[in-house]
């Protein structure tokens, strides 16, 4: 006998602050507490977007192992303190350059950093360094980017300008996720489950914002899987060819990629999407300033248009 499948009818935040949330979901069929909890936990820890420092330029030094004249901290210590600053980026910008200029003895804090209107420092009292020389002027440029997950220096895209020090970036606003599964009774049966999910964040995003993003990521993946069972309508050949020609004639500025990736493409003479898809992945990899992250952006943007790198355009017309 086929029993009716039970879906949760109680989903609520048992506790919620800007940095902590405890979500309860019940009832779930046996085994689904772990299935749902584990999938959400993995996505929350690995795939939620955030902001982080990716490069620093400290005027007067050229590598992170330098001492800084007139400053108590060396470059490594100063950069470690900078990485503790929490930046909130609003709007569509993916990259911002911030400036810190401080002269004279005293402590330097995050509040000394000059930020544009779309960037907010959530912990302005974060200590950065102490200037010990009354005549010393500390000048720093800070590159802040949006990203996802943890990106080590080895995977960062090189910055052509001299003086920039690349920094390991932990973009994830989610610091810890845990879940617990308990039995719960529905009617006469006590074999159903209650899922309790705990989320700890750094304050750049709230637990419910992170949860919403995680659900959206999972939802998109399941929708793509569902599409394989949907019969796709046949597109007349002439219409398909005309649509392709229209896409290829578009400017690369129509692509959903970062300004940095866009500038890198323009530097090598690529102005249209047609120019871009003629290039192979290996050709782009060998191009200066197009690293792993930019390449992934480009491939994803082309995929959204039904295109890919290395296309033989002539045979498709």
From Swiss-Prot:
<keyword id="KW-0548">Nucleotidyltransferase</keyword>
<dbReference type="InterPro" id="IPR011773">
    <property type="entry name" value="DNA-dir_RpoA"/>
</dbReference>
<protein>
    <recommendedName>
        <fullName>DNA-directed RNA polymerase subunit alpha</fullName>
        <ecNumber>2.7.7.6</ecNumber>
    </recommendedName>
</protein>
<comment type="similarity">
    <text>Belongs to the RNA polymerase alpha chain family.</text>
</comment>
<dbReference type="GO" id="GO:0046983">
    <property type="term" value="F:protein dimerization activity"/>
</dbReference>
<comment type="function">
    <text>DNA-dependent RNA polymerase catalyzes the transcription of DNA into RNA using the four ribonucleoside triphosphates as substrates.</text>
</comment>
<dbReference type="InterPro" id="IPR011263">
    <property type="entry name" value="DNA-dir_RNA_pol_RpoA/D/Rpb3"/>
</dbReference>
<keyword id="KW-0804">Transcription</keyword>
<feature type="region of interest" description="Alpha C-terminal domain (alpha-CTD)">
    <location>
        <begin position="245"/>
        <end position="317"/>
    </location>
</feature>
<dbReference type="GO" id="GO:0000428">
    <property type="term" value="C:DNA-directed RNA polymerase complex"/>
</dbReference>
<dbReference type="Pfam" id="PF03118">
    <property type="entry name" value="RNA_pol_A_CTD"/>
</dbReference>
<dbReference type="GO" id="GO:0005737">
    <property type="term" value="C:cytoplasm"/>
</dbReference>
<dbReference type="InterPro" id="IPR011260">
    <property type="entry name" value="RNAP_asu_C"/>
</dbReference>
<comment type="subunit">
    <text>Homodimer. The RNAP catalytic core consists of 2 alpha, 1 beta, 1 beta' and 1 omega subunit. When a sigma factor is associated with the core the holoenzyme is formed, which can initiate transcription.</text>
</comment>
<dbReference type="GO" id="GO:0003677">
    <property type="term" value="F:DNA binding"/>
</dbReference>
<keyword id="KW-0808">Transferase</keyword>
<dbReference type="Pfam" id="PF01193">
    <property type="entry name" value="RNA_pol_L"/>
</dbReference>
<dbReference type="InterPro" id="IPR036643">
    <property type="entry name" value="RNApol_insert_sf"/>
</dbReference>
<dbReference type="Pfam" id="PF01000">
    <property type="entry name" value="RNA_pol_A_bac"/>
</dbReference>
<dbReference type="InterPro" id="IPR036603">
    <property type="entry name" value="RBP11-like"/>
</dbReference>
<keyword id="KW-0240">DNA-directed RNA polymerase</keyword>
<feature type="region of interest" description="Alpha N-terminal domain (alpha-NTD)">
    <location>
        <begin position="1"/>
        <end position="229"/>
    </location>
</feature>
<dbReference type="InterPro" id="IPR011262">
    <property type="entry name" value="DNA-dir_RNA_pol_insert"/>
</dbReference>
<dbReference type="GO" id="GO:0006351">
    <property type="term" value="P:DNA-templated transcription"/>
</dbReference>
<dbReference type="GO" id="GO:0003899">
    <property type="term" value="F:DNA-directed RNA polymerase activity"/>
</dbReference>
């Amino acid at each position: 006998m086929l029993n009716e499948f039970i879906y949760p009818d109680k989903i609520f935040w048992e506790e919620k602050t800007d940095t902590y949330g405890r979500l309860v979901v019940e009832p779930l069929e046996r085994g689904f507490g772990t299935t749902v909890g584990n999938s959400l936990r993995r996505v929350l820890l690995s795939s939620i977007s955030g902001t982080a420092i990716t490069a620093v330029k400290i005027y007067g030094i050229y590598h992170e192992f330098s001492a800084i004249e007139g400053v108590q901290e060396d470059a490594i210590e100063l950069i470690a303190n900078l990485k503790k600053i929490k930046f909130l980026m609003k709007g569509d910008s993916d990259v911002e350059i911030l400036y810190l200029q401080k002269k004279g003895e005293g402590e330097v804090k995050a509040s000394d950093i000059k930020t544009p209107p779309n960037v907010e420092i959530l912990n302005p009292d974060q200590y950065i360094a102490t200037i010990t020389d009354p005549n010393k002027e500390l000048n720093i440029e800070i590159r802040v980017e949006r990203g996802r997950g943890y990106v080590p220096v080895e995977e960062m895209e090189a910055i052509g300008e001299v003086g920039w020090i690349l920094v390991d970036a932990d973009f994830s606003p989610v610091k810890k996720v845990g879940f617990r599964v308990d039995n719960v009774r529905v009617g006469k049966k006590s074999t159903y489950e209650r899922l309790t999910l705990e989320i700890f964040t750094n304050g750049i995003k709230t637990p419910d914002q992170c949860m919403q993003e995680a659900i959206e990521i999972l939802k998109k993946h399941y929708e793509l899987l569902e599409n394989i069972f949907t019969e796709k309508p046949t597109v007349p050949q002439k219409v398909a060819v005309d649509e392709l020609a229209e896409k290829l004639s578009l400017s690369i500025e129509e692509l959903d990629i970062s300004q940095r990736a866009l500038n890198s493409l323009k530097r090598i003479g690529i102005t249209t999407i047609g120019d871009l898809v003629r290039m192979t992945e290996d050709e782009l990899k060998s191009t200066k300033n197009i690293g792993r992250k930019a390449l992934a952006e480009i491939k994803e943007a082309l995929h959204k248009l039904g295109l890919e790198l290395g296309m033989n355009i002539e045979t498709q017309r």
